[in-house]
């Protein structure tokens, strides 16, 4: 079977929401929502191999460390594993005083009763009950009319209120979800929720949570935002209700739908770290939080060591995080393109500490989430001098002069073309070392002695030429001019740069020289030494040897 030529014969577009006076498009997110992780429930139930108790405990502690204050930990009536995990959290005193656990139950008497048994002794808990409300579920799955759906919800709400009253030592919160909210008629969603409100009688001091799931994402994010704004206008006791969002990513816009839903007036978000969950996953709490962070709003969640969080999530879920996943993927802060690398390098060069972040192609400073800069620029056959220069600067403190950047990039390009692979900073440095720092043939500097008097420099050098020792002597207005005068070939210094590598007692000097031998194109050399004069001499010998070697190769 192939794709239909006319998909309208099989699929219908989602109907638009009649909300001509919608206000959310002109709003921005200025307040942090209440965050609730569903990793241990919605995320866990979507895994090929659900987490065992040890993994769930490890995950729970990670969520606490990140700063989650509401954590949906289990579906305790669904399995003994989930039930026992809730008991271990409570009896083992693993729940901090500022954290509230949440558990899910279907709207059935036996399951609700079992759920309350799991929570006995908890200091605080959210009981989350749900039933499906969408027309297709009413008709196909449950064979219920609208009143039947309302009765299921209100009967469950009454039982929850009764059982909570029997355990007064626990600080209870109630949550109701009209499952498949995003595909339910808005008027009916409000009708069901208002019926639950009438049972639970919330107040501004003791609010209930109405969770509005896009259980299956079936429209563009603006439609979900319209639904949230419409619902907020029409639900009873809005000041006593926390509107919660629970989006999925079936169309790839779960994050966008949630952000627009917050602009439309929602107060709370349920989701999973890195977007785990049924089918295409729940909304990614990390992306949401760091999107806020990069807009100057701290999400009150701490991802300062995002790779440590990822490690726990990957090992517990037994699912890898995609290398292109926002903020956390291995490649999200990486540039291979030469033009991108050049822009990033220039951005880092001008970026001042504590200033507004303006580095091109990087929406967040990787250091803020515990990343180093090594992976920001990586070199392959598409890379240019900017990326190569950046890696040498960041990893080895070597700042190549501009013309030398061009020269060395051709060396690297030749190697990447030959290998067809990415090159690491270490491999690039090895190339630099072999091309420049180990260029000690045919002339090898053994030792030198410098005398300076009345503005004149005299240098005596011991040099090995093709294995034979030679003595050179030169005089000039400075050490380099004296060295050039001592050379057995005619050479001209075209450019010279130097800088320190490191600081303090362990600092070394790096010198870069561009020379031109008579009848040849200019070439560069590098020298590194604790002494700046020695470094400059080594740089000149490096350039000299490269020039002589290339001339001989050309002649051959």
Swiss-Prot record:
Recorded catalytic reaction(s): these are: 3-methyl-2-oxobutanoate + acetyl-CoA + H2O = (2S)-2-isopropylmalate + CoA + H(+)
Q: Which cofactor does it need?
A: Mg(2+)
What are the recorded GO MF terms, alphabetically?
2-isopropylmalate synthase activity; acetyl-CoA C-acetyltransferase activity; magnesium ion binding
Report the residue ranges that make up the Pyruvate carboxyltransferase domain in this protein: 33-307
Cell compartments where the protein resides: Cytoplasm
Name its GO BP terms in alphabetical order: L-leucine biosynthetic process
Which parts pass through the membrane?
Answer: none
Q: Where is the signal peptide?
A: none
Q: Which UniProt keywords apply?
A: Amino-acid biosynthesis, Branched-chain amino acid biosynthesis, Cytoplasm, Leucine biosynthesis, Magnesium, Metal-binding, Transferase
Question: Cellular component terms, GO, for this chain's entry?
Answer: cytoplasm
- What are its E.C. numbers? 2.3.3.13
Regulatory domain as annotated region, ranges: 439-556
CDD domains on file: DRE_TIM_LeuA (cd07942)
- InterPro entries in UniProt: 2-isopropylmalate_synth_dimer, AIPM/Hcit_synth_CS, Aldolase_TIM, IPM_Synthase, LeuA-like_post-cat, LeuA_allosteric_dom_sf, LeuA_N_DRE-TIM, PYR_CT
Q: Where does Mg(2+) bind?
A: 42, 246, 248, 282
Q: In which pathway does it act?
A: Amino-acid biosynthesis; L-leucine biosynthesis; L-leucine from 3-methyl-2-oxobutanoate: step 1/4
Record-linked Gene3D superfamilies: 3.30.160.270, Aldolase class I
First-level EC class? transferase
Can you state the subunit structure given in the record? Homodimer.
Q: Would you identify the family this protein belongs to, as annotated?
A: Belongs to the alpha-IPM synthase/homocitrate synthase family. LeuA type 2 subfamily.
| NCBIfam families assigned | leuA_yeast, PRK03739.1
Which purpose does this protein serve, as stated in its record? Answer: Catalyzes the condensation of the acetyl group of acetyl-CoA with 3-methyl-2-oxobutanoate (2-ketoisovalerate) to form 3-carboxy-3-hydroxy-4-methylpentanoate (2-isopropylmalate).
PANTHER family xref list: 2-ISOPROPYLMALATE SYNTHASE (PTHR46911:SF1), PTHR46911
Q: What is this protein called?
A: 2-isopropylmalate synthase
The record lists the organism as: Pseudomonas paraeruginosa (strain DSM 24068 / PA7)
List the taxonomic lineage.
Bacteria, Pseudomonadati, Pseudomonadota, Gammaproteobacteria, Pseudomonadales
């Amino acid at each position: 079977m192939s794709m239909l030529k006319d998909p309208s014969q099989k699929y219908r577009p989602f109907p638009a929401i009649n909300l001509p006076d919608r206000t959310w498009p002109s709003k921005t997110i200025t307040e942090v929502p209440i965050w609730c992780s569903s990793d241990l429930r919605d995320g866990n139930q979507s895994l090929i191999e659900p987490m065992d108790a040890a993994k769930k405990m490890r995950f729970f502690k990670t969520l606490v460390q990140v700063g989650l204050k509401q954590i949906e930990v289990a579906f305790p009536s669904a399995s003994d594993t989930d039930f026992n995990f809730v008991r271990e959290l409570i009896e083992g005193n693993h729940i901090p005083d500022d954290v509230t656990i949440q558990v899910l139950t279907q709207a059935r008497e036996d399951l609700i009763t079992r759920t309350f048994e799991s929570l006995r002794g908890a200091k605080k808990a959210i009981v989350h009950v749900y039933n499906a409300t969408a027309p297709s579920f009413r008709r196909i799955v449950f064979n219920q009319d609208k009143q039947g759906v309302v009765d299921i919800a209100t009967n469950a709400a009454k039982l929850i209120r009764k059982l909570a009253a029997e355990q007064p030592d626990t600080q209870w919160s109630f949550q109701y979800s009209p499952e498949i909210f995003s595909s339910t008629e808005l008027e009916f969603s409000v009708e069901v929720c208002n019926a639950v409100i009438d049972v639970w009688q919330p107040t501004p001091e003791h609010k209930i949570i109405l969770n509005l799931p896009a259980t299956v994402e079936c429209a563009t994010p603006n439609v979900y935002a319209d639904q949230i704004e419409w619902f907020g206008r029409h639900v009873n006791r809005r000041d006593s209700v926390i509107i919660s969002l629970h989006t999925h990513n079936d169309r790839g816009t779960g994050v966008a739908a949630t952000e627009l839903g917050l602009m439309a007036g929602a107060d709370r978000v349920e989701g999973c770290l890195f977007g785990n969950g049924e089918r295409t996953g729940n909304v990614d709490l990390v992306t949401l939080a760091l999107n806020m962070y990069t807009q100057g709003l701290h999400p009150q969640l701490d991802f300062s060591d995002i790779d440590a969080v990822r490690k726990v999530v990957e090992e517990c879920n037994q699912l890898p995080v995609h290398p292109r996943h926002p903020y956390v993927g291995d490649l999200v802060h990486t540039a291979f393109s030469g033009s991108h690398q050049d822009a990033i390098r220039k951005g880092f060069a001008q970026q001042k500490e504590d200033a507004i972040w303006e580095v091109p192609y990087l929406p967040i400073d990787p250091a803020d989430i515990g990343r180093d800069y090594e992976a920001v620029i990586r070199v392959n056959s598409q890379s240019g001098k900017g990326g190569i220069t950046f890696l040498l600067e960041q990893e080895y403190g070597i700042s190549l002069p501009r013309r030398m950047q061009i020269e060395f990039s051709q060396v690297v390009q030749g190697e990447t073309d030959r290998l067809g692979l990415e090159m690491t900073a270490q491999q690039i440095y090895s190339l630099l070392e072999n091309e420049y720092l180990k260029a000690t043939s045919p002339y090898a500097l053994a030792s030198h002695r410098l005398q300076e008097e009345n503005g004149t420099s005299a240098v005596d050098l011991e040099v090995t030429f093709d294995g034979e020792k030679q003595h050179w002597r030169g005089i000039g207005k400075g050490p380099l001019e004296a060295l050039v005068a001592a050379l057995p070939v005619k050479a001209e210094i075209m450019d010279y740069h130097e800088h320190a590598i490191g600081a303090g007692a362990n600092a070394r000097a790096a010198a870069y020289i561009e020379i031109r031998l008579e009848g040849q194109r200019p070439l560069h050399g590098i020298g590194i030494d604790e002494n700046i004069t020695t470094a400059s001499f080594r740089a000149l010998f490096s350039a000299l040897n490269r020039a002589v070697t290339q001339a001989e190769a050309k002649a051959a």
